[in-house]
Amino acid sequence: MSNDFKVIINGQNIDNGQKIIFEKSQDVPKPIFDIGDNEYYTIAMVDPDAPSRENPIYKYFLHMLIVNNYQTLVSFQPPSPPKGSGYHRYFFFLLKQPKYIDQNIWKQQINNNSIRREKFNLSEFISDNKLTVIASTYFKTKR
């Protein structure tokens, strides 16, 4: 969606929709984006195809959540599509926050289970935290 938002994996800039060899997808992604004065962003990495595109009962699986620009709230869990489940898409969303949000508020959401890895409700998370989608990109991988 935006040329200003990039994700680097294994030293390579990811093109939207690019297929990546599974082994290379295991490196921690490095999101790169412009930050203005007094601007705060959240980055979510999700898999809408868990455990398969035909039966995505864990949609969205949360692989990583970074808040307040570079504070890790949910640590990176590498892609792990089940063998034989075909290509999985791994989306990165750059979300603008209305302001800096105290870590304790985010941690409360984790404690009440509104932020969890399986069945992460991305739309609700965006709405509840008054976030705005600025950009997104994704890659595909399979085993």
UniProtKB/Swiss-Prot annotation:
One of its GO terms (cellular component) is virion component. Its main location: virion. It is found in: Virion. It comes from the Viruses. The keyword Zinc does not apply. CDD domains: PEBP_euk (cd00866). One of its GO terms (molecular function) is lipid binding. The keyword Cell inner membrane does not apply. Keywords: Lipid-binding, Virion. Gene3D superfamilies: PEBP-like. PANTHER family: PHOSPHATIDYLETHANOLAMINE-BINDING PROTEIN, PHOSPHATIDYLETHANOLAMINE-BINDING PROTEIN 4. Belongs to the phosphatidylethanolamine-binding protein family. This is Phosphatidylethanolamine-binding protein homolog R644. The lineage of its organism: Viruses, Varidnaviria, Bamfordvirae, Nucleocytoviricota, Megaviricetes.
